[in-house]
């Protein structure tokens, strides 16, 4: 391999490493939480509303300016669930979605069925409540 070919190959490898590291997974390290002390009673239909709301936040925040509010109307006499998803502007849309999906799966364990919660990971944030936010 000539020196010119070697230099070109080296430049391509360095560029590939830089692109791969820039497109890495989101940082889902736990930062903080605030959980309402009131709990959702077992079997309450609010769980279904809240579950649908979290999926909505996970799927739409990245495509709504990285700061998205939504609500899920109550069914079966349950209160409406209100929520907000936020991602750092510096991450990709796919990393935003991945971060919120990760957080959506962890929020139950962090806040133990609380009727309201705010949980921050390094790259994303979810808040949900039983009142408009």
Swiss-Prot record:
Residues 28-133 form the Gnk2-homologous domain. Keywords: Antibiotic, Antimicrobial, Disulfide bond, Fungicide, Lectin, Mannose-binding, Plant defense, Signal. One of its GO terms (biological process) is defense response to bacterium. Disulfide bonds join 35-111, 87-96, 99-124. One of its GO terms (molecular function) is D-mannose binding. PANTHER family: ANTIFUNGAL PROTEIN GINKBILOBIN-2-LIKE, GNK2-HOMOLOGOUS DOMAIN-CONTAINING PROTEIN. This is Antifungal protein ginkbilobin-like protein 1. It comes from Picea sitchensis.
């Amino acid at each position: 391999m000539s020196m010119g070919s070697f230099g070109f190959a080296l430049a391509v490898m360095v560029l590939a490493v830089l692109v791969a590291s820039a497109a890495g997974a989101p940082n889902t390290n736990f930062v903080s939480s605030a959980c309402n002390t009131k709990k959702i009673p077992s079997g309450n239909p609010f769980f279904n509303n809240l579950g649908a709301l979290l999926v909505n936040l996970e799927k739409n925040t990245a495509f709504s300016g990285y700061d998205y509010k939504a609500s899920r109307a109550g069914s079966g006499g349950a209160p409406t669930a209100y929520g907000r998803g936020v991602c750092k502007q510096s991450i990709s849309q796919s990393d935003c979605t991945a971060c919120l999906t990760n957080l959506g799966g962890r929020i139950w364990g962090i806040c133990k069925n609380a009727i309201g919660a705010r949980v921050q990971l390094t790259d994303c944030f979810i808040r949900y409540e039983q009142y408009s936010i």
